[in-house]
Amino acid sequence: SQXPQSETDYSQLSGEWNTIYGAASNIXK
């Protein structure tokens, strides 16, 4: 999102992606 909280939104998105990527890595294995 745009605005003063963009860094917070990016951090939250990054955390969500880490969770998704971790799950995908497990499936993948």
Swiss-Prot record:
Instruction: Write down any Gene Ontology CC term.
Output: extracellular region
- Does the record carry DNA-binding as a key word? no
Principal location class:
secreted
Judging by the UniProt lineage, the source's domain of life is Eukaryota
Q: Where in the cell is it found?
A: Secreted
Q: What keywords appear on the UniProt entry?
A: Allergen, Secreted, Transport
Q: Where is the signal peptide?
A: none
Family the UniProt entry places it in = Belongs to the calycin superfamily. Lipocalin family.
What this protein is called in its record is Dander allergen Equ c 2.0101
